[in-house]
Design a protein with these regions (language model features):
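A short glycine-rich, Lys/Arg-flanked "PGG" loop and its adjoining helix->strand segment in the class I
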Residues: 160-177
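Conserved class I S-adenosyl-L-methionine
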Residues: 81-91
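A basic, amphipathic helix-loop patch mediating RNA/tRNA/ribosome contacts
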Residues: 1-50, 84-85
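Short, glycine-/aromatic-enriched active-site segment of Class I SAM-dependent methyltransferases
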Residues: 182-199
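Flexible, glycine-/basic-rich loop-and-beta segments that form/coincide
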Residues: 236, 240-267
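Conserved SAM-binding loop of SAM-dependent methyltransferases across substrates and taxa
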Residues: 92-103
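S-adenosyl-L-methionine
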Residues: 108-161
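Glycine-rich helix-loop-beta junction characteristic of Rossmann-like nucleotide cofactor-binding loops
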Residues: 16, 74-81, 143-144
Length: 267
């Protein structure tokens, strides 16, 4: 075996993970130890001869995305029992899985890609798999059920382009938990090597713009926190909690939130 083999591939080859995607999720969640030392980067190589073990709880969802929605549900007053939901940017389906495990009656799993949704979810009668579908142009004809809840985890596009269509799909009082990704919200000149945004000042600007875009699209912003895990390249990301309602916005101390996120998720 080549000593250049990536850690995520090693986990799969050694039977420690069902698939490479699940291996990446377990590694990035901090559960993988090589020769007794935690390694949290899936692309780490040069470990072929070292003992590898997975410690602690295995990932409860088909991907680590479920951990992000799990935190949103613990932080904000979100309950999904018997709710009609949408997972925008479903990919493997971590958010969808989390919704189902929390009692969702039906989930529309929407992604512009194809063939990514985990088979467990694809074959679940509560899931409507909507592949090759650009959420920016979703219509009530495609999702005829008024949505109680939607999650958004999209890449290479700003949330402000998703909000208008989603507003028309949510019932009055419907809620959103969305992932705010600085690498796709900041201007190109503010994005560093490998697409990583490290500057706390830029993070604060991104959150301020998020608040503006949400309000311009008639959503009430009731909460913001940081994601419990970094993005694939190491980006700190944030979670927003929105509602289609006439309630007043919450009050947010963005500098403190950004400082806390950098302290808790430091390299």
């Amino acid at each position: 075996m080549s000593n250049k083999t990536r850690l995520d591939i090693l986990l799969t080859e050694r039977g420690l993970a069902e698939s490479r995607q699940k291996a990446q999720a377990v590694i990035m969640a901090g559960h993988v130890f090589v020769a007794g030392q935690r390694v949290d980067k899936p692309g780490t190589a040069g470990l072929s001869d070292a003992p590898i073990e997975v410690r602690g709880h295995t990932l409860p969802y088909v991907s680590r995305g479920g951990l992000k929605l799990e935190k949103a549900m613990k932080t904000f007053p979100i309950t999904l029992t018997d709710k009609i939901c949408a997972d925008i940017g479903a990919s493997t389906g971590g958010f969808t899985d989390c919704m189902l495990q929390n009692g969702a009656r039906k989930v529309y799993s929407v992604d512009v890609g194809y063939g990514q949704l985990d088979w467990k979810l694809r074959s679940d009668p509560r899931v409507v798999c909507m592949e090759r579908t650009n959420a920016r142009y979703l219509t009530p004809e495609q999702i005829p059920d008024p949505l109680d809840f939607a999650s958004i985890d999209v890449s290479f596009i700003s949330l402000k382009l998703i909000f208008p269509a989603l507003y028309g799909l949510l019932r009055q009082g419907g809620e959103i938990a969305c992932l705010i990704k600085p690498q796709f919200e900041a201007g190109r000149e503010k994005v560093g090597k490998k697409g990583v945004v490290r500057d706390p000042t830029v993070h604060q600007e991104v959150l301020e713009h998020f608040l503006t875009h949400a309000r311009e699209n008639h959503f009430t912003v009731l909460g913001i926190t940081y994601s419990p895990i970094r993005g694939p390249e190491g980006n700190i990301e944030y979670l927003g909690y929105l509602k289609k309602c006439d309630e007043p916005d919450g009050s947010f101390d963005l500098p403190t939130l950004v400082a806390e996120s950098h302290s808790q998720l430091k390299d």
